[in-house]
Amino acid sequence: FTGWSAKNGHWQFPSENDGTFVYRQSWHDAGPKFLLGMLIYPEQPAMKDGRDVLDRLASHPRVAKFICKKLIRRFISDTPKQALIDSAATIFRANWQAPDQIERVMRHILNSDDFINSFGQKNRRPFDAAVAAMRALGGDWTLRPDHSRSNDFMWLYGFTGHAPYNWPAPNGYPDTGLAWSGSNSFAMTWRVLGWLTETRDGEVPLHPIVDTTRANVPVANWTANNLVTWWCTRLLGYQPQAARKQALVAFMAQNGDPNTYVIADTNTWQGSDLKRHYNHERLRSLVALILMTPEFMSR
């Protein structure tokens, strides 16, 4: 791959500095090479050495198993079964020149019994959790440079240890639950999830939790049990285990009856009667708590 480069302001070509790919024939080692049992002949046409290497790797059986194992680990389980690795690798190799090669491999993996039975076996990494929360909360804001809330988010998110493109080794961030199950990883991810539910951009909430609740649960039905049930369905797709749901209901109800007391659509201080105390703030905190449950943090 000598000669494969980028236009990066090199001293020989200072005017070329836009980051695009460039092949420089004069930099290329045109001598013979030997790779994985294959002889690469000398003085080949431009870029053919590199393309021959890529073709050799793309068709190699160990490469097929390596990539398929990573895909299965990503989508199914931290400990992929060898039978599925082998069957996926067979499809990978049989279609190594097909334009839809990865699509065929993924269709095989996602239609497998291993995938069908994999619910809850994977943990969401911090990035997955943050993006899933934004999607589920109906956010409509875009991270962008020179924007205070975007900068706040990226600063806070950086403490999770999962900042995009920040892993120094070429193997990418770990994709196993153990790597992201430490107290720091969870705590920093929870901070991000809490921030997403509470933060405003000026006077506009980043995520319209109160408005979403109004649009989907009639205010006359705002009992603690109804609110928890609706938001669990929205964020999880199902109801969490009974003890966990009861804790969420108790938090939302405070000193009110969870089944009969209708929580007012207000946000005022009522310190002597907690069932009426900062109801909107409590609703947003309820949503944050659901996002922090094991049910949301798994997939």
Which residues does each PLM region occupy?
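Non-catalytic, conformational "gating/processing" segments within enzyme and secreted inhibitor domains
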Residues: F1-K81
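Short coil/turn linker and secondary-structure boundary residues
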Residues: W4, P45-K48, D100, W222, ...
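Flexible, low-complexity segments enriched for small/polar residues
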Residues: H60-A64, C68-W96, R107-R299
